[in-house]
Amino acid sequence: MAFDLPFIWAAIIAFAVLAYVILDGFDLGVGILFPFFKEKHDRDVMMNSVAPVWDGNETWLVLGGGGLMAVFPLAYATVLPALYMPLILMLLGLIFRGVAFEYRWRTKRGEFLWDIAFAGGSMVATFMQGVALGALVQGIPVENRAYAGGWWDWLTPFSVATGVALLVGYALLGATWLVMKTSGALAARARGHALKAGIGTLVAMGVFSLWTPFMEPLYFDRWFGWPTVAFSLLVPLLVLGCFALLVHGLRTEHDSHPFLAALGLFVLGFAGIGISFYPYIVPASLTIWQAAAPEESLAFLLVGALVLVPMILAYTAYAYWVFRGKVDPEEGYH
């Protein structure tokens, strides 16, 4: 029985990217919401809610990026020159966020500066992730197996709008995480922010669902052609279901339901992108088979992935299990 190794690896990398988005998304969302909570005590609790897990969440970014370079080198060599600027700014934002997270607990006199760095780094990293996604969706020109565009091709109204939409989406993840992990006045305020961000996310998903099909003929065929239209019609219905669960959970104070609903919205958005892209890894220039490394390399790397991915899943699940439940405002991890 022959295995379609490029397809298997595309699924692994897609899973790693999705895991990064939904896991690092909520702690970036906490940083995005930082300016809306002025009290030092609230900010301390917010940071303590993500302190045990935030750095482990970025493991999935390393797996996704490293896997892309090793398994789909042609796609990596094509996408990277097209997105140098947003990716570099994203990494700088993540560095600022990480440094601020640690140094904020070590100083009192300059604490407000690290608060600014934490919020600013989270916003820059999120916005640039959205811009990079928008630039990929709108298409990257390829000629002779190399990037054929200009330095600023990534900066368009569509990519900027995608960056803003991701800021709203991560704010939703962060707010629902705070609803689930905190209590009292902080959780009550987080519910208000979650409802606003949820409405914004729903509107953004609707706008991009109407906008994206007209970016490429491939997308239009995927969303409105038969038989894929039968699957694509399910996505907006499920989105509305997740939004209803979000609102119901916020109103009835079932604190885990809003976070699960927010995760569902991101999974459905990711599924929509998958419907639009497949079988392309660089739309509409390179398929996963055209961009893949030799079969021998894919098989060798798959052996390592079959060991590492379950290990990452196991320690991630264990960390979340150990630190489950509400954060005690009087205790912390720093």
Feature map (PLM): residue ranges:
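Membrane-interface helix-loop-helix modules in multi-pass inner-membrane proteins
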Residues: V53-S122, E143, R222-A230
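N-terminal signal-anchor module of multipass membrane proteins
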Residues: M1-G56, V62-G65
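Helix-coil boundary and interhelical linker segments in multi-pass alpha-helical membrane proteins
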Residues: M1-I13, M69-Y84, V137-P157, F214
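Juxtamembrane membrane-water interface segments of multi-pass membrane proteins
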Residues: L28-P52, A70-A75, V79, E102-F112, ...
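Long, contiguous internal "core" modules enriched in hydrophobic/ aromatic residues
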Residues: Y103-D255, G272
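Alpha-helical transmembrane segments
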Residues: W9-Y20, P81-L92, A119-V124, D153-L167, ...
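Short, membrane-exposed interhelical loops at transmembrane-helix boundaries
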Residues: V282-L301
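Central hydrophobic cores of alpha-helical transmembrane segments
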Residues: L260-V267
